[in-house]
Amino acid sequence: MKIITPRVPSAETGFSYARPFFEDLVDTALAHAKKLGATDAGAEASEGYGLSVSVRKGELENVERNRDKSLGVTVYVGQRRGNASTSDFSRAAIERTVQAAYDIARFTAEDPVAGLPDAEDIATTQPDLDLFHPWALTSEQAAKIALECEAAALATDRRITNSEGAGVSAQQSHFFSAHTRGFRGGYASSRHSLSVAPIAGKGAGMQRDAWYSSMRCAEELASPEAVGRYAAERALSRLKSRKISPR
């Protein structure tokens, strides 16, 4: 099977690979598994990218960008199963990965419950759950939001004396999965978050707590001020805590 040339999808998604490319990767893997003699096989191609920024005590601490890709293959030989994965999308790498999964399956003990679902249990429709809302966030914007969150926590009460930092993360991913009994499907999703961990009190009486907001859509995140204040209130509530008597 000829593998299509990956083309960059629209800038709206930010992904490096389009779904048709993933479909072809998966179909290539499944076809090779059957060629080797597999009873059944499943494969999933995925890609993710994102940005994470952390600050502490009013200073930028870390900026991390990630972009990952993977093809995972599961091969069944009777009731025996083998798994292998690769981040190399070349045809040769795909065939090596399938071969590795097949070899593992051949020498693995049988599992009476291993196998793919029956036809009547396979999903044939995929509702749109509105899970994908990419966030075109720059590192400067992320740092500004994190600093605002930490500042809000520190300004809540004079008893908030320190901070373990605040962070902002924007993550996007998509995948396509299929197996030899007919299932085909996949979707894109996003997960964005904002968090902070303030410290209340001094010396041996210091207490730490944290709070966060995590949403599919960045517009639905709680404000930096709200997250910071609530995290501070949680830390303050721990001051002068004592053990409850068992009696």
Task: Give short role names for the model-derived ranges.
Residues 1-247:
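Active-site bordering "gate/hinge" segments
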